[in-house]
Amino acid sequence: MNLEITGTSAEYWSDLAEALNTPMMKQFLTIKKDFPDTILFFRMGDFYEMFLEDAKIASSILDIALTKRQNAVPMCGIPYHSKDNYISRLLNAGKKIAICEQSKPEETGSKLMTRDVVRIITPGTVIEENLLTGFQNNYLAVLHLKKSLIYFAMADFSTGELFYSSTPITSLEKLVAELEKFRPSEICVPQSELSFFQELEYFRDKEFTVLKDQPEIPEKDQFQILSRYLDEYIRETYRDNKLVLREPRILSSGKFLEMDRETILNLELVENGKEKNHTLYSIFNFCNTAKGKRLLKQRILFPECDPMVLYSRWEKQDILFKIVLAPFIAALRDVGDIERILTRFRGNHSYPRDFRSILNSISTGIKLKKELEALSYPFLIPLEELKVLSEFIEERLHPGDDLPVILGNGPFLKTGFSTRLDKAREAGFKGKDWILSLEAEEKKRTNLNTLKIRYNKIVGYFIEISRAQAEQAPKDYLKKQTLVGSERFTTPKLEEIERTILEADEIIQEIERAEFNRMVEEVLKYSSALLSFSEEIGDLDFQISVLIAKDKFGWIRPELSKDRSLNLVDSRHPVVEATLPPGQEFVPNSVYLDTQNQAIAVLTGPNMAGKSTFMRQIALNQILFQMGAFVPAKSARLPIVDKLFTRIGAGDNLTAGESTFYVEMKETANILNHYTEDSLILFDEVGRGTSTYDGMSIAWSILEYLSSLSVKPKTIFATHYHELTELSRLSGIFNLYLETLEKEDKVLFLRKVKVGKAKKSFGIYVAKIAGIPEPIVKRAAELLIDLESKKKEIRIQEAQPTLFIEPESKNLPSETEESILKLKLEEMTPMEALKKLEDFQKKLRKQK
């Protein structure tokens, strides 16, 4: 703990020593010593106070006043009832918060309260409803190194979900991809492994939570080590609460379509930069339950590789397709977030209204079960168990949806459940009526118009009279408290009524608290049934969302390809089409790829013609297919793809000292080192980040290599190197291009993909419409004409040498030389040959 305080005078240091020597500050320092990496929220009355370095950090982040206790100790504070807003801002800044509550005096007659830390809130352990971001998952990652493998867990404490997986150290791309999918709020590593993870490139700007090392166990049981780390962290952060995680799901290789980090980002599956709009998730999300929304996101990021799973989803959709969905959609809106409610129950953060949510959810589930069974839809919920739980809650819970947010702020149990409770409530109601009656009587008796009877938790009930009228108070008024502008009194009659009310309130609180706790325990007994119900509800919500998307966007059911070929007819980009302005239509395109004769498409066309969009729509159609959803196309026959790679666009990674070209080559290397025969690869402009011949040589070599494979991965290779179209003579390679139309001095991008190669790049036209100054555009056009006619290279000295070893230079034949080589002399007369020779002489003289 850093206790450094600036100050120069001897008096200051004397004041500081004295301030830190008080019983309260000694207590603070003792507690703070055990939680040095947290900001300690130290409860004092109705405030949480922060001291010393905690106060400096918190006041800066929260933008609240920093003051000094006894002129020496820096401090700041927040009201206890509004702590969630402040905690949320500290969590967003990556801080941990220790909540220290006060209970009772340390000993009889002592003014110092007993205080204990009851909860440590960290970015990855949030379960409090007000601190979570809507329905979204909030994951914590635990990483563990054992020999040549990295084991990792992704746990969402707010829902209880838990995922395990592992990857070789040599394949860190998988770990990085999983971190991109789960986006953990906090990453934990064992103390002894911290330096290893800090050295990894991906983690260089990441903060870690350091965990105590666990005892060694057999190598085959390393997932158990992850469980131990999680259990220990739960005990540390939740203290004595009963929080538990569910059985882990193993993310085994081959079960889901693998996508690396770059692919997830390039395709904008769930995020578009820092925005959430214009993504596959945003246009597809028609879900009405929190579980459905989380499940949809998981299925986008983890498309299936098992055809039987796809058939199962399609069968459910076929049943739902025959009915009117509106009643089901309306019913789903009444289902609460069961997973998070159960977690709150275990973590002692539940609310009275959570029981109403469970009751409404079960009621909805029972209705849905009846209707879906009639349709032969497999809605597999534990109906009988849920009915028993529903009856138990119904017997006790106060009717209506206006249950109190906090227990004690209104009726929680229904009238008639407890005779003792009913009597206490009646006494309380009567007592409050007596208070109103007494106030009216006293105003009339004393003729004091400022007289009011009020209540607070410290003073209790009191008669308040303004200072101006206080001297006129009757002699039977007993003074209770003096304030700046008023005097407070009591009377024997008021004290008697107060005792009646407070005794009634105590009885009400005692009964409701005891029954609340009992109801929590009872609900937790049915956790398994409720979670099973939640999964079924989420899946139903997902299937309905799929059907809504189909109807809204005109998508079709794809077929499963049995021969590995990919055939999309008039396919469209789902996100671009969904977000087009009214009146605009997306231009559809077709593509066929197999693993032999038409495996590798070299795609040419100008910038802005739509090459990247075309490639992305192929990838998104494939993902939708493997989610078990419909796809935007006229028809689609698609294979199961095991890995999807995209190399679309790259930028400098300056913080890591990496150029655009180096980033591009790293991404390309990852693809070439990890693809399989069943992969789908989308390359965009490989080699553009270096000199023309370097880049073209690399691109050429990649295409030659892929062509040489006996079974070729399905590949789209977009390029501006038109020379690469000559490779269509190689096995499996064919050409596609984006059609354009030249009209007067304009170029129309028709967005249509055709077989063949592009004639021009139209780069100068794109520069013109982008706003490049006219003199530069004109000069560029002149140079282009000159270069294309003479085929001469303008050599500009490069600022850095090439990254590759230059092969021995071989002069390419000139246009004239190529013309000579093409002459068929055996078919020409001597006169014709002499005439051609004369033409060549004239042409060469002009070029000198």
From Swiss-Prot:
MF annotations from Gene Ontology: ATP binding; ATP-dependent DNA damage sensor activity; damaged DNA binding; mismatched DNA binding
Domain of life: Bacteria
Signal peptide start and end residues: none
A cellular component annotation (GO) from this entry: cytosol
Keywords, sorted A to Z: ATP-binding, DNA damage, DNA repair, DNA-binding, Nucleotide-binding
Alphabetical list of Pfam families matching this protein: MutS_I (PF01624), MutS_II (PF05188), MutS_III (PF05192), MutS_IV (PF05190), MutS_V (PF00488)
Keyword Plastid listed: no
Ligand binding (ATP): G605, P606, N607, M608, A609, G610, K611, S612
Main function: This protein is involved in the repair of mismatches in DNA. It is possible that it carries out the mismatch recognition step. This protein has a weak ATPase activity.
Family note: Belongs to the DNA mismatch repair MutS family.
Name of the protein: DNA mismatch repair protein MutS
